[in-house]
Amino acid sequence: MPSRTDELSASLIRNINDVSMTRLLREPNYDAKGARLAQGTVAQKLGASFDVLEPGKCGCPYHLHHAQEEMFIILEGHGTLRVAGEMLPIRSGDVIFIPPGPDYPHQIVNTSDTQLKYYSISTRETPEICEYPDSGKYLAEGSLKSSKPFGVINRHTQGLDYWDGEP
């Protein structure tokens, strides 16, 4: 039977050296490894991951959040923060703050010839809408404790009339 110390440690602490990394590869632009750190913890409103981008690659598409706020802590390497239509240099030691809303679509790009390692920390607000300006898509997701999680990805131009399918 686990001790109270073991239980607390397992529910409160993650070490990046002990978590398994999952690779996201979608050529030609995306090649990242990541570990979700908050899964299995008692965290309720914060999420975190440890991310590694390969040279010349991105981890996710250019996007913005309607509800979630994000922070990135650059641990090793350098690259570019594409944000609000601008390209900003980033490097080891930088802490990046991205509030929700339409003013700060963002994407981290490894523009160097070595790996870029960083923490991604975010609030876990639901419901959430995420927009992708380059492709015109949106993601809407949410969940209620009494139902299955809800999620849909669509394009703005493919929407339905409010009354579609209603009696």
What are these regions (language model features)?
Residues 77, 93, 108:
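Short hydrophobic/aromatic patches on the structural cores and recognition surfaces of FHA
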